[in-house]
Amino acid sequence: MSQALMNTAAATAETDAAMSFKQNEKIVYENNKLHKRLCRQVGQAIGDFNMIEDGDKVMVCLSGGKDSYALLDILMTLRERAPIKFDIVAVNLDQKQPNFPDHILPAYLKQLDIPFHIENQDTYSIVKRLIPEGKTTCSLCSRLRRGILYRVADELGANKIALGHHRDDIMETFFLNMFFGAKIKGMPPKLQSDDGKHIVIRPLAYVKEADTERYAEVKNFPIIPCDLCGSQENLQRKQIKGMLREWEKKFPGRVDNIFSSLSTVVPSHLMDKELFGFADLKATGEAMANGDIAFDEEPCSTGSTSIPGIIPLRADD
């Protein structure tokens, strides 16, 4: 090989190495930014809804999915930085699904050096026995799992139960209840458990599913698929998820507005007579902040600006 070719090859190798170094730097930067964003969003949700207080013992429900892994990881980070003291115990419910790799979670949790508990309960057989083939198992599975987790929380002395539901889950539940249950009802970030003994929290309430997916890849979490319910096709939740994904693609910002609307509810402008005292409403002679003036200030009512995805009415409609 001539000296010129050798010089060219060396220069090319140096250029490739420099590009590779820059790419790696960018990846590290983006991954660090993702971690900071998740910590900020989880911390904000905890603060906004007073999810965790000094002296709490938080039972983190770990399913082996990307979301619960992310939840545990971020809570462990925040615990080190928080101005308050709280304990974490990770709990997995082994439902005895066929081919469930029951060695993965114990091995992972031992590496973290945190308290954990594996609860063995054969809910899989119960669900398969009671639910006809082809029918959705989610509802019964959820009820059985919930009851077991409440009992385990009692046994472990945990007063808070942390679940890995994220922002997308909350919006999907909102539309599921609206479309199929005729209710304006979502998935609250904090609520009292059915038995009245615990507070259930969802610290990922502000976190997008896309971020937990990416974070799982970055952290290389040992994901365990759910063969009981996750593999079922044509679930209503999947239809809603597809609808929201399509909206986000066609009309950027719409899904963000929907999520924001869940925190800016005006009961006087809905139709729930239990939520607002329509029957007792009287004219007081004083202007009301949420009166008809609210309709005059709608941002979408100015000029002829069209709303993406909405067909405007003709004058004679």
From Swiss-Prot:
Transmembrane segments: none
Comment on bound cofactor: Binds 1 [4Fe-4S] cluster per subunit. The cluster is chelated by three Cys residues, the fourth Fe has a free coordination site that may bind a sulfur atom transferred from the persulfide of IscS.
EC number of this enzyme: 2.8.1.-
Cofactor names: Mg(2+); [4Fe-4S] cluster
This protein's pathway: tRNA modification
Chain location of the short sequence motif PP-loop motif per the record: 63-68
InterPro entries on file: Rossmann-like_a/b/a_fold, TilS/TtcA_N, tRNA_Cyd_32_2_STrfase, tRNA_thiolation_TtcA_Ctu1
Gene Ontology MF: a single term: sulfurtransferase activity
Reaction(s) the record says it catalyses: cytidine(32) in tRNA + S-sulfanyl-L-cysteinyl-[cysteine desulfurase] + AH2 + ATP = 2-thiocytidine(32) in tRNA + L-cysteinyl-[cysteine desulfurase] + A + AMP + diphosphate + H(+)
CDD domains named among the record's database cross-references: TtcA-like (cd24138)
Annotated residues for binding of [4Fe-4S] cluster: 138, 141, 229
Pfam families registered for this protein in UniProt: ATP_bind_3 (PF01171)
Coiled coil: none
Keywords: 4Fe-4S, ATP-binding, Cytoplasm, Iron, Iron-sulfur, Magnesium, Metal-binding, Nucleotide-binding, RNA-binding, Transferase, tRNA processing, tRNA-binding
Subcellular location(s) per record: Cytoplasm
Gene Ontology BP terms: tRNA thio-modification
N-terminal signal peptide: none
Any one GO CC term of the record: cytoplasm
Purpose: Catalyzes the ATP-dependent 2-thiolation of cytidine in position 32 of tRNA, to form 2-thiocytidine (s(2)C32). The sulfur atoms are provided by the cysteine/cysteine desulfurase (IscS) system.
Note, other: The thiolation reaction likely consists of two steps: a first activation step by ATP to form an adenylated intermediate of the target base of tRNA, and a second nucleophilic substitution step of the sulfur (S) atom supplied by the hydrosulfide attached to the Fe-S cluster.
Subunit structure: Homodimer.
Annotated family: Belongs to the TtcA family.
Official protein name in the record: tRNA-cytidine(32) 2-sulfurtransferase
Provenance organism: Janthinobacterium sp. (strain Marseille) (Minibacterium massiliensis)
Gene name of the record: ttcA
